[in-house]
Amino acid sequence: MTYRSIGSTAYPTIGVVLLGGIANPVTRTPLHTSAGIAYSDSCGSIRSETRIYADEATHIYFNGTESTDDNRSVRRVLDRYSSVFEEAFGTKTVSYSSQNFGILSGSSDAGAASIGAAILGLKPDLDPHDVENDLRAVSESAGRSLFGGLTITWSDGFHAYTEKILDPEAFSGYSIVAFAFDYQRNPSDVIHQNIVRSDLYPARKKHADEHAHMIKEYAKTNDIKGIFDLAQEDTEEYHSILRGVGVNVIRENMQKLISYLKLIRKDYWNAYIVTGGSNVYVAVESENADRLFSIENTFGSKKKMLRIVGGAWHRRPE
């Protein structure tokens, strides 16, 4: 049977062991191990939607605007799987359309993973880890969104592999409150290109691997607090190194909020994560989520209640 299109959905991500440094701009293989979670809101409305469809010429659309895709990453993945499209659609020529909804950060992972979900929907016997390796051309941490829950992407700088550590159900007693600030984001490539200049980078690579192994141990006993406490420690190390090479992600009001969170911690547990953008993500036990969400002074940020969710998925081809 010949189809005309397939749609898919994937969810954005938050780093837990933060990634800094890629091997090269083409394969985007990470230089060291990292970890992350996929997130959305209570009804799954924070997401990336993708449609791949047969066409007379290839067009690539992001949020309704056609892109030249100058780095050719999406086009490269579509070309790589042209035989899959030919088998399903009767033609190798396809177009791609992606739309993001409410994403705070991690949209590249979601966009890449939604491509992977569509490809796997058309050819289920493909190895998802092989597909993930190709998706890295779009986003180096695409596996976080492709597999969902809590994942670790093990990497030695030459080869990378994403391992699913915990399903989202393991986090059912926890919520994440996002505090979104209106600061300009540092592009991920600025971080990747600068952090490797630090004299502390070799130690950072070692610590990231150690943190990932510790998270895997915490996961064995469902020590969710241990995982997020370590994520906060990782955030603090990571951004200290970035400041040392002139990349300041945590701006004034973000730091004020972080200081306030540490005061709140005397009353009830919380742990924060800052990745490369202008958001402070705060893990908290669900019983205290409303208390955290209702704090009056957010230092100019907007709040959003989040939860950890599963991997990317596809619809029935049409």
Swiss-Prot record:
Optimum pH is 8.5. Substrate binds at L19, E140, R144. Keywords: ATP-binding, Isoprene biosynthesis, Kinase, Lipid biosynthesis, Lipid metabolism, Nucleotide-binding, Transferase. Pathway: Isoprenoid biosynthesis; isopentenyl diphosphate biosynthesis via mevalonate pathway. GO terms for biological process: isopentenyl diphosphate biosynthetic process, mevalonate pathway. It comes from the Archaea. Transmembrane segments: none annotated. SUPFAM superfamilies: GHMP Kinase, C-terminal domain (SSF55060), Ribosomal protein S5 domain 2-like (SSF54211). GO terms for molecular function: ATP binding; kinase activity; phosphotransferase activity, alcohol group as acceptor. Changing L18A: Strong decrease of the affinity for ATP, but almost the same catalytic efficiency compared to the wild-type. ATP binds at Y96, S97, S98, Q99, N100, S105, G106, S107, S108, R185, S188. Homodimer. Catalyzes the phosphorylation of mevalonate (MVA) to yield mevalonate-3-phosphate. Functions in an alternative mevalonate pathway, only present in extreme acidophiles of the Thermoplasmatales order, which passes through mevalonate 3-phosphate rather than mevalonate 5-phosphate. This is Mevalonate 3-kinase.
